[in-house]
Structure formats: C-alpha cells, structure tokens
Design a protein with these regions (language model features):
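Charged/polar, solvent-exposed surface patches and flexible loops
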Residues: 11-15, 22, 54, 91-94, ...
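Membrane-proximal basic amphipathic "stem/tether" segments
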Residues: 1-38
Length: 244
C-alpha cells in the first residue's frame, strides 16, 4: 500500500511535465522502441526495430532501455540506444512521433510520451482473457477505471492509439481487452514471426543443433501467467521425466 501511495504521489508531481510536452513539436522521423519494462532487447519491438533499421533509412529508430548491458550490446551492433532516464533518452521520448512497446508504456519512459502515437505490438494472442476482459484484473476496479484514468493518465494503460493483432479471429478481443475501437486494431501479425516466412532464417535452431548433436529438440512454449504461485501444468502422468 505504501509503495502505491509513493508511486501515485510521483505521478502527481510529474503531471505538469506531462501536459507541457504537448507544446513541443513531434518529429515524425523519430520512432522510439522498448520492450519488457526496458529490461530486454527482444520480442516484437526488437524485430520491428531491426526491420526499420534495415529497410527504412528515412526513420531514426531509437531503442530505450533500463538495462546497461543492453545499452552496451546494442551500441556495439550500431543500434542507437539510450538509457530510459538519461537526458537523451528523455528527449527522444518527448520528440518521437511514434512509440512502439510490446508489453506496457513502461517499456520506454512513460512519463515523457504524451502526444505521441503509441502502438502496443503486444506479445501474443488472447487465448485467455486479458486486460479489461479479465474481470479479476485490478484494471476493472473503481480506483483504476475512474481515479487513475482521470487523475493519473501517466499510469493509465488504456489510452493506446493502436494495438496489433495476429489475425482477424483475435481482433475483436484485442479491441475489448484494450478498450479500443475496432478500427484501432491493426491486423499486422507479430513482427517476431516474420522470420518464419523470410529467406534469411534465424540462426537459433542451427546453434541448438550444433550444441546438442544427435538429439531430439523439443520446444516448450507456455503461455504467460500472472500468478507468482508455482503451478504444475502437467496434469497427466503418462510421461517419463527422465526421457523428457
């Protein structure tokens, strides 16, 4: 409870800066990217970022991170990258016309993106209820849906301009999950999946085969779970753990 009070107190302090940003012109050639609360260089944001770097020279793609290891690694690869709370990181968040995230606005610096076109690329398909469709989620509480929405816009997670969808079958659910109009859902598919349709294949499989020769490689790809409580999802007992 105390940490939440501190968090919202900080949001109140930043409110003037949140609205002052609207007076600063955006640069449509600056696109800012981030992923997983700034801690990873991965997922849909990374693949779209790399695509922009390779095929859109007119766009200045900038990666924002909270992780110094990513900062060093990205710069070695020639990717323009800044720490979330560095002066340049803040400045480019303010100036960017387009912001791309893969989980939440905290993937970049959520305090300095007011007035930008914010696109949530998301990180999967809603096979289970997420966001506003999940009646047990705190986002459906009175405090979040009324107080946070109107007084703490920095923290509010349902003011994206667009979200992406993997297919038409998921688009309606993405709209209701993020409280958006259907027209704000872009059926683009996952940028991270484009590699499966590309002539240039990802080298990850080749590296695994080299590391584990004469082995059968099985991918285990579970869905994300909010609960921190360990759960045994293997409910059947007709398998041998040693063989696995």
């Amino acid at each position: 409870m105390g940490s939440n009070l501190i968090k919202y107190f900080i949001y109140l302090i930043f409110l003037p800066f949140w609205y002052v940003q609207l007076l600063i012109p955006k640069n449509k050639s600056i696109w800012v990217f981030g992923a997983w609360y700034g801690e990873r260089f991965s997922d849909n944001s990374m693949y779209l970022y790399k695509n922009i770097q390779d095929f859109c020279p007119e766009v200045r793609g900038i990666w924002i991170t909270s992780n110094k290891e990513i900062l060093v690694s990205n710069r070695k690869q020639g990717y323009e990258t800044y720490m979330k709370w560095s002066l340049k990181g803040i400045w480019f968040c303010v100036k960017a016309k387009y912001i791309f995230v893969t989980s939440r606005k905290q993937d970049v610096n959520e305090f300095f993106i007011n007035g930008a076109v914010i696109v949530n690329l998301w990180h999967g398909s809603p096979l289970k209820k997420i966001g506003a469709d999940d009646k047990y989620s705190k986002v459906n509480s009175f405090f979040y849906s009324k107080i946070v929405k109107n007084i703490f816009p920095i923290s509010y997670e349902f003011n994206y301009d667009f979200v992406t969808s993997n297919a038409a079958i998921f688009s309606d659910k993405m709209a209701t999950s993020f409280k958006l109009n259907r027209s704000q859902v872009l059926e683009t598919g996952c940028p991270r999946n484009d590699v499966f349709f590309s002539v240039t294949k990802d080298s990850y499989n080749a590296k695994l085969i080299e590391k584990f020769p004469n082995s059968t490689i099985v991918y285990y790809l579970p869905t994300f779970r909010n609960s921190a409580i360990p759960t045994n999802i293997f409910t059947q007992e007709d398998y041998d753990e040693d063989e696995l």
